[in-house]
Amino acid sequence: MAHAAQVGLQDATSPIMEELIIFHDHALMIIFLICFLVLYALFLTLTTKLTNTSISDAQEMETVWTILPAIILVLIALPSLRILYMTDEVNDPSFTIKSIGHQWYWTYEYTDYGGLIFNSYMLPPLFLEPGDLRLLDVDNRVVLPVEAPVRMMITSQDVLHSWAVPTLGLKTDAIPGRLNQTTFTATRPGVYYGQCSEICGANHSFMPIVLELIPLKIFEMGPVFTL
């Protein structure tokens, strides 16, 4: 999860997020290289007194500055397309959960567990227990197993919302009248936080998402939902 004064991305809790972090570092190194080359060329231009105004044609130079950017774009596009394909891939999920966005709370349906349905509201400051996070904790957490593929069906009852959990690398829009889906496999237990990531009205900042990830054996033993 996030912590105070954090500069980088949150620690990965899913294979997709691990791939996103690697791609982020890969793209950032290319950007740093481009910035260095531009600054170096600018430095040479400002400090040298040598000029050449008689050049009317530079075929080699034009070839280089046409091919080199194309190669750089390919180096960025190929891993990006690979990750984009992975995010849309559905690999035989163990079970399915439906998430419905409202102004300003979430409803969850465990369709594979007897049609369990519950609402998840942000905890007001007066109801926070020691250790709870202000504006992030909820009254009913979503309990999920680790090391099991989960399919999340996401929609909205009223306006546009977005179901996002950064540590899992998830962000899927909740659109009225449309059912979107995303899949993920958590790799380690813990409590992870997300928020609605689409401006949806006055209380947009007050509809957090809390996932409690537990070992699969414990999840299969019986009721673990804190309702």
From Swiss-Prot:
Keyword Cell inner membrane: no
EC number: 7.1.1.9
Compartments, record wording: Mitochondrion inner membrane
Membrane-topology annotation of the record: Multi-pass membrane protein
Annotated transmembrane regions: 15-45, 60-87
First-listed, main subcellular location of the protein, grouped into a coarse class: mitochondrion
Amino acids binding Cu cation A2: C196, E198, C200, H204
CDD domains: CcO_II_C (cd13912)
Spans within the Mitochondrial intermembrane topological domain: 1-14, 88-227
Keywords: Copper, Electron transport, Magnesium, Membrane, Metal-binding, Mitochondrion, Mitochondrion inner membrane, Respiratory chain, Translocase, Transmembrane, Transmembrane helix, Transport
Catalytic activity: 4 Fe(II)-[cytochrome c] + O2 + 8 H(+)(in) = 4 Fe(III)-[cytochrome c] + 2 H2O + 4 H(+)(out)
Mitochondrial matrix side: 46-59
Pfam families reported in the protein's UniProt record: COX2 (PF00116), COX2_TM (PF02790)
Cellular component per GO, a single term: respiratory chain complex IV
Cofactor note: Binds a dinuclear copper A center per subunit.
Enzyme class per UniProt: translocase
Protein name: Cytochrome c oxidase subunit 2
Organism: Pan troglodytes
Phylogenetic classification of the source organism: Eukaryota, Metazoa, Chordata, Craniata, Vertebrata
Gene it is expressed from: MT-CO2
